[in-house]
Amino acid sequence: MPSSVVCDAGGVLAIAGVLEGTVPVDAEFLALDWSTMTIGRFVAARHEGSPERIHVEIGLALSVVHEWFPVRTLVTETLSRAGQGAVDALDSWSALILAETLDLPLFTASDEVSSDRIEIRRPW
């Protein structure tokens, strides 16, 4: 059985090959539904003016996730831990909290999150 890894949007994009880097192999990838919007925003900015490419790349990115979790149960803790200045990193903070809750590693492309409870893996 493969090991499980929680991913934020950057982790999902790296696994899908949209971002460069080394990715976990033989793993089950878990993510929050919240990450879908962050992934969409990134891909739309990357392929502005090309809806077909946006559609395909979002589909490819989302297909690497094996299980999606709802973010609603983590909103309060995310906002509390992330602070007011973490607007662009809220997805990463939510994923970190999910990873800590499940006692699994986090795969992220963010430098803004850290934990003394779980392993954090990055694509670089």
What residues fall within each predicted segment?
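Alpha-helix capping/helix-boundary segments
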Residues: 11-12, 35, 74, 94-95, ...
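Active-site neighborhoods of divalent-metal-dependent phosphate/nucleic-acid chemistry enzymes
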Residues: 67-109
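Short loop->beta-strand "edge-of-pocket" segments that line small-molecule binding or catalytic clefts
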Residues: 5, 27-30, 63-64, 68, ...
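His/Asp/Glu-enriched, well-ordered alpha-helical/loop segment
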Residues: 39, 60-62
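Short glycine/serine- and small hydrophobic-enriched flexible loop segments
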Residues: 41-45, 100
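Short, well-structured N-terminal submotif of metal-dependent ribonuclease cores
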Residues: 1-35, 46-55
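Residues that scaffold the ATP/ADP-binding catalytic core of kinase and kinase-like folds
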Residues: 14-16, 42, 116-117
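Acidic, PIN/NYN-like endoribonuclease modules and their adjacent C-terminal/linker elements
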Residues: 2, 32, 96-124
